[in-house]
């Protein structure tokens, strides 16, 4: 028994965890396979951020259990950290359950089933990401304690990862031809607060000093902690794409305080103005929660007005999900699902209009694009203003001789609500 596969659910941080597990197991001589039916060991990296994520994880486990036969089914990640005993009781087909950050325990477990096999350590690099980009996790955990979020209980307090290891990982990927590195953590603005004399600005400067042609993208910046130094660094460094993902969650101060969030609408507007003045070409992305307990219709409409005023380039919306163990779980004034759905749909419809207008404004302009996938007669690419998996894409039709992971110059020819079309020039 030496073949394994990994099914990854949830956020980019889980993607990184899966990649590290794959690397560790291949170095131990196990073989990564993409097809479930060829695997002796099936790993499922789970998520429990909201109810939909929990349901998706459980559905994936049940599907794997149904076709298990003589395979070993191993579940790890956030859901199993939080509900490990319940999973083992309710789904007896599961052979082992691990939490987060237990890679060494997983390796010890899997090795016991192959004691008599002759293993050869592999130098092949398998990945759960395309050949164009890699997520780079720069910190683990979170100490924010937002009232709607279970992450601190699952992943622990915020810990910055070793900068030398981060730089080494990126440098190795640059040498292998990767063209984009997406820095992720629950809140990257906190990076370095627990290190002596090493800050996020220093990390960005050190990353940009690595020789090579690549992009650096920043995801998940806490709005109140984006300072002038960080804005200046992003503006000055050519390798950092002018794209900021700033989850604001709401515009109204009363709701923000119930959420355990800092900041006010006035402060947010001031910060956005400051960023756009310093970086005129910046793409701003944010996420918001609708239907948080006690959110009134007036507060929701003021949120809609705020979104209209700011004109975010990219926007994500979540319907509030009641999570056990969070402070918001016991709040009175829970919003009915039909109201959440209506509010969600209204914001998404408004944002679709904004997005269409912004995408049509790109028509006739030339950009550098990074190709993620080649599929039949089309290629899927992204501009600096597109983060993978969460934003739209560029659809290219003249794809002869193109390769995934390649950068090309393109002309935008059509714009839609979320995607654009282009041709290579």
UniProtKB/Swiss-Prot annotation:
GO-annotated biological processes: tRNA modification
User: Which CDD domains does the UniProt record give?
Assistant: Radical_SAM
What residues bind [4Fe-4S] cluster 2, as annotated?
142, 146, 149
Please provide, in alphabetical order, the Gene Ontology terms of the cellular component aspect for this entry.
cytosol
Can you give the residue ranges of the Radical SAM core domain?
Answer: 128-357
Q: What does this protein do?
A: Catalyzes the methylthiolation of an aspartic acid residue of ribosomal protein uS12.
Q: Note whether Glycoprotein occurs among the keywords.
A: no
What SUPFAM superfamilies does this protein's entry cite?
Answer: Radical SAM enzymes
Q: Which UniProt keywords apply?
A: 4Fe-4S, Cytoplasm, Iron, Iron-sulfur, Metal-binding, S-adenosyl-L-methionine, Transferase
What residues does the TRAM domain cover?
Answer: 360-425
Query: Which N-terminal residues, if any, form the signal peptide?
Result: none
**Which pairs of positions does the record mark as disulfide bonds?**
none
Q: Which residues form the MTTase N-terminal domain?
A: 2-115
Q: Which InterPro entries match?
A: Elp3/MiaA/NifB-like_rSAM, Methylthiotransferase, Methylthiotransferase_CS, Methylthiotransferase_N, Methylthiotransferase_N_sf, NA-bd_OB-fold, Ribosomal_uS12_MeSTrfase_RimO, rSAM
Organism, by scientific name, is: Thermodesulfovibrio yellowstonii (strain ATCC 51303 / DSM 11347 / YP87)
Q: What class of enzyme is it?
A: transferase
Cofactor(s) needed by this chain: [4Fe-4S] cluster
Binding of [4Fe-4S] cluster 1: at which residues? 11, 47, 78
Query: What is the cofactor note?
Result: Binds 2 [4Fe-4S] clusters. One cluster is coordinated with 3 cysteines and an exchangeable S-adenosyl-L-methionine.
Record EC number: 2.8.4.4
Give the family from UniProt.
Belongs to the methylthiotransferase family. RimO subfamily.
Q: Can you name this protein?
A: Ribosomal protein uS12 methylthiotransferase RimO
Name a Pfam family for this protein: Radical_SAM
Reactions this protein catalyses = L-aspartate(89)-[ribosomal protein uS12]-hydrogen + (sulfur carrier)-SH + AH2 + 2 S-adenosyl-L-methionine = 3-methylsulfanyl-L-aspartate(89)-[ribosomal protein uS12]-hydrogen + (sulfur carrier)-H + 5'-deoxyadenosine + L-methionine + A + S-adenosyl-L-homocysteine + 2 H(+)
Compartments in which it is found:
Cytoplasm
What is a GO molecular function of this protein? 4 iron, 4 sulfur cluster binding
């Amino acid at each position: 028994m030496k073949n394994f596969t990994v099914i990854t659910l949830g956020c980019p941080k889980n993607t990184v965890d899966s990649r590290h597990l794959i690397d560790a197991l291949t170095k131990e001589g196990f073989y990564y396979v993409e097809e479930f039916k060829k695997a002796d060991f099936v790993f499922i990296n789970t998520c429990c951020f909201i109810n939909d994520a929990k349901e998706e994880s459980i559905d994936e486990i049940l599907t794997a259990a149904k076709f298990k036969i003589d395979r070993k089914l191993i579940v790890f990640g956030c859901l199993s950290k939080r509900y490990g005993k319940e999973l083992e009781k309710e789904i007896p087909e599961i052979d082992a359950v691990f939490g987060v950050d237990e890679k060494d325990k997983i390796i010890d477990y899997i090795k016991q089933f192959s004691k008599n096999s002759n293993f050869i350590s592999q130098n092949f690099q398998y990945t759960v990401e395309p050949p164009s980009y890699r997520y780079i996790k720069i910190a683990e955990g979170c100490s924010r304690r937002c009232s709607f979020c279970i992450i601190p209980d699952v992943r622990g307090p915020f810990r910055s990862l070793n900068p030398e290891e981060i730089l080494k990982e990126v440098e190795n990927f640059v040498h292998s031809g990767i063209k984009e590195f997406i820095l992720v953590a629950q809140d990257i603005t906190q990076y370095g607060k627990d290190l002596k004399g090493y800050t996020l600005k220093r990390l960005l400067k050190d990353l940009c000093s690595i020789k090579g042609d690549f992009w650096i993208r920043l995801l998940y910046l806490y709005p109140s902690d984006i300072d002038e130094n960080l804005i200046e660094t992003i503006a000055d460094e050519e390798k950092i794409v002018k794209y900021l993902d700033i989850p604001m969650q709401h515009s109204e101060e009363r709701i923000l305080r119930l959420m355990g969030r800092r900041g006010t609408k006035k402060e947010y507007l001031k910060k956005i103005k400051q960023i756009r003045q310093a970086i005129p070409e910046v793409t701003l992305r944010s996420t918001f929660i609708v239907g948080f307990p006690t959110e009134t219709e007036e507060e929701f409409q003021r949120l809609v007005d705020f979104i209209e005023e700011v004109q975010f380039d990219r926007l994500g919306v979540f319907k509030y999900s009641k999570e056990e163990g969070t402070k918001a779980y016991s709040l009175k004034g829970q919003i009915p699902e039909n109201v959440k759905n209506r509010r969600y749909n209204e914001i998404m419809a408004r944002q679709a209009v904004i997005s269409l207008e912004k995408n049509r404004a790109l028509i006739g302009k030339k950009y550098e694009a990074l190709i993620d996938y080649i599929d039949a007669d089309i290629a899927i690419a992204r501009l600096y203003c597109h983060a993978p998996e969460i934003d739209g894409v560029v659809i290219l039709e003249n794809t002869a001789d193109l390769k995934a992971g390649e950068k090309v110059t393109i002309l935008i020819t059509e714009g839609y609500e979320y995607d654009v079309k282009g041709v290579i020039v």
